[in-house]
């Protein structure tokens, strides 16, 4: 799942769902980084995309938190 999917569908979810999504992405990022260190990663562009997706979701969560105050 990349930015196109996150932009529309996931940013409308609740904060709990977004936090779960961040955890899922972080787990996937960990797996990709492990594969990279072992040398079996074929699609290295996914690491950058997932890092950016995590940042986008966290930015939305922070904006919601500041907006609620």
Swiss-Prot record:
Q: Which GO terms describe its cellular component?
A: ribonucleoprotein complex; ribosome
Q: Which GO terms describe its molecular function?
A: structural constituent of ribosome
The answer on whether this UniProt entry bears the keyword Ribosomal protein reads yes
**GO BP annotations listed:** translation
**Which key words are in the record?**
Ribonucleoprotein, Ribosomal protein
Entries under PROSITE patterns matching the protein: RIBOSOMAL_L29 (PS00579)
Q: What Pfam families does the database record attribute to this sequence? A: Ribosomal_L29
Q: Which InterPro entries does UniProt cross-reference here?
A: Ribosomal_uL29 (IPR001854), Ribosomal_uL29_CS (IPR018254), Ribosomal_uL29_sf (IPR036049)
HAMAP family given in the database record? Ribosomal_uL29 (MF_00374)
- What's the family? Belongs to the universal ribosomal protein uL29 family.
Q: What is this protein called?
A: Large ribosomal subunit protein uL29
Q: What is the lineage of its organism?
A: Bacteria, Bacillati, Mycoplasmatota, Mycoplasmoidales, Metamycoplasmataceae
């Amino acid at each position: 799942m990349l930015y196109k999917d996150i932009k529309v569908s996931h940013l409308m979810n609740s904060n709990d769902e977004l936090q779960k999504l961040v955890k899922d992405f972080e787990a996937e990022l960990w797996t990709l980084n492990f594969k990279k260190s072992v040398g079996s990663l074929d699609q290295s562009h996914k690491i950058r995309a997932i890092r950016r997706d995590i940042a986008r979701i966290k930015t939305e969560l922070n904006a919601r938190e500041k907006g609620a105050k």
